[in-house]
Amino acid sequence: MSKEFSRAQRVSQQLQKELAVILQREVRDSRIGMVTISDVEVSRDLAYAKVFVTFFCVGEQTPETCLAALKEHEVPVRMMLGKRIRHRLTPEVRFTYDNTLVEGMRMSNLVSDVVNTDKRKMAESGRTESDEGEE
C-alpha cells in the first residue's frame, strides 16, 4: 500500500497550521495587518519552507509594505516554530505574497465585462441569444 501523502506534504500542512497560530497570536506588528497563509511548500529535504501569504490591507497599507514588515519577522517566527514542532530541523521560512486571489478576481471581472459587452451589442443590434445558435 502506497502512502497517500509524502512526508513533505504532511510537514507542509503542519507548518501551515502552526504558522497561522504564530502569526495570529505571537507576532505583534501593526504594519502587517490581517495575514492569511494560503499555502506552504516545503523542500524535499525539509530545510526550506516557502510560505504563501495574502493580506487584508487597511488604510495606506499595501501588500508590498505588509510583506516587507512580515519578512522582518522571518527569524523570530522560525524560532517560535522550532519550539512548537518536533522535527530534527526547523525549516528556514520565506514569506512570499500570493497574488492568485487578486489575479483570479481580475480575470473574473474581465470575463464578466466581455459577456456584458456582448449582451449589450446583441441588444443594440436587435438580435437575441437564440438567434446566435441558428446561424
Curated annotation (Swiss-Prot):
Keyword Ubl conjugation: no
Annotated GO CC locations: cytosol
UniProt xrefs under InterPro entries: KH_dom-like_a/b, RbfA, RbfA_dom_sf
Pfam families cross-referenced by the UniProt entry: RBFA
Origin: domain of life: Bacteria
Localization in the cell: Cytoplasm
Keyword NAD: no
HAMAP family, sorted: RbfA
NCBIfam families reported in the protein's UniProt record: rbfA (TIGR00082)
Primary role: One of several proteins that assist in the late maturation steps of the functional core of the 30S ribosomal subunit. Associates with free 30S ribosomal subunits (but not with 30S subunits that are part of 70S ribosomes or polysomes). Required for efficient processing of 16S rRNA. May interact with the 5'-terminal helix region of 16S rRNA.
Family of the protein in this entry: Belongs to the RbfA family.
Subunit structure: Monomer. Binds 30S ribosomal subunits, but not 50S ribosomal subunits or 70S ribosomes.
Protein name according to UniProt: Ribosome-binding factor A
Gene: rbfA
